[in-house]
Swiss-Prot record:
The keyword Amino-acid biosynthesis applies. The active site is at residues 79, 181, 183. It is found in: Cytoplasm. This is Imidazole glycerol phosphate synthase subunit HisH.
Amino acid sequence: MIGIIDYGMGNLRSVEKALKYVGYDAKITSDAKEIKNFEALILPGVGAFPDAIRVLIKTGMAEEIKIHIEKGKPFLGICLGMQLLFEKSFEGGKTEGLKIFKGNVVGLPKGNKIPHVGWNSLTIKKDTPFLKGIKNGDYVYFVHSYYVNGNEKDFEYAVTEYGIEIPAVIIKDNVFSCQFHPEKSGETGLKILKNFGEMIKCL
């Protein structure tokens, strides 16, 4: 069973529906005590970093997420859920994150329309089962005003261009993350969620 973490933000039902469509059972939870029961976790998200991390800490879910990851269980962060994995964000000031990955979350540079909303193509940098069946130039759906400016270049598996190169997929051990929304990315996104489900059996 895959747990979808509910902290008051994100496309929870869309993620749940997409997972079920590709054949995986999922349950939405806001109960920190329940997190340990899941084989894998997904942290989706649309919203402000400071608000999100505040809720995760207050509810005890932040600590349970860290325990889940430390145990080697599969974890997927989507959009804001990816950004929350980093050390800190400069959205609305400076806020510490979950510190799973090294680096910061910063605002997209001026020049292009902000927020970055819509379809953009992926450039695949490394092979991974997470991106099985995904090709260079495949389009996925983005909605964000901030991006990861991190120190995890060795773990970048795909990027996109929006005035600058933006990390689109970062994978480190059992932790998977994507800046785009697979649940909104049509057949390409469904393939990625199916791949994540298949990898749960292998990790």
